[in-house]
């Protein structure tokens, strides 16, 4: 309660609230990243691979990438192809994607969440650049875009650089 009431906007919003003891919870250190996304006979998908943030979650983007890429690995293995190069690329690209999502969208974002005008501007810019550089890729490039984690490969890299300039 004391934590929430330190912020002037939260204090105003909750001025008439009836508090229930023990009903306020928070967690620290939610983000995590698996050190290995795929290996010999396994691939992690969705939140099993990594989690960044509940507010601006890239979860659905990562689900589409990890499941599609895992399926491609399985199909290649069933055809008798060597999958080690694809596994190595998948691990490296996903690690770069995770780091770049953090740098582009999350780093220092919570520092100005209580500042409406600044947060609104950042949110609008984030959404616009997200749709131009991330969400549009499968529509522009087809299924090949689902096999590339966002912000880790050339088509979405410029959007990563633009987003991290103002966050």
Feature locations, PLM:
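Conserved FAD/dinucleotide-binding core of flavoprotein oxidoreductases
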Residues: 1-22, 26, 50, 58-61, ...
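Residues that form generic nucleotide/phosphate-binding pockets
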Residues: 2-6, 13, 89, 93, ...
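A general structural signal for short secondary-structure boundary/capping elements
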Residues: 21-29, 89, 136-141, 152
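FAD-binding beta-loop-beta segment adjacent to the flavin cofactor pocket
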Residues: 24-50, 54
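Conserved active-site and cofactor/substrate-binding residues in soluble primary-metabolism enzymes
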Residues: 43, 62-65, 85
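A conserved FAD-binding loop/helix module that cradles the flavin
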Residues: 52-71
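Active-site-proximal substrate-binding core of FAD-dependent oxidoreductases
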Residues: 69-123, 134-135
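C-terminal auxiliary extensions adjacent to catalytic cores
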Residues: 112-167
């Amino acid at each position: 309660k004391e934590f929430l009431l330190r912020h002037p906007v939260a204090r105003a919003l909750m001025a008439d609230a009836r508090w229930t003891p023990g009903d306020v919870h928070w967690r620290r250190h939610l983000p995590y990243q698996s050190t290995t996304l795929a290996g010999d006979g396994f691939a992690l998908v969705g939140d099993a691979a990594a989690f960044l943030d509940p507010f601006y979650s890239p979860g659905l983007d990562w689900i589409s990438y990890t499941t599609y890429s895992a399926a491609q690995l399985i199909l290649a293995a069933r055809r008798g192809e060597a999958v080690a190069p694809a596994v190595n690329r998948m691990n490296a690209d996903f690690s770069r994607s995770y780091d770049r999502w953090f740098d582009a969208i999350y780093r220092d974002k919570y520092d100005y969440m209580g500042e409406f005008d600044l947060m609104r501007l950042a949110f609008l810019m984030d959404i616009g650049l997200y749709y131009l550089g991330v969400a549009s890729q499968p529509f522009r490039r087809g299924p090949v875009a689902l096999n590339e984690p966002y912000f880790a490969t050339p088509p979405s890299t410029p959007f990563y650089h633009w987003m991290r300039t103002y966050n």
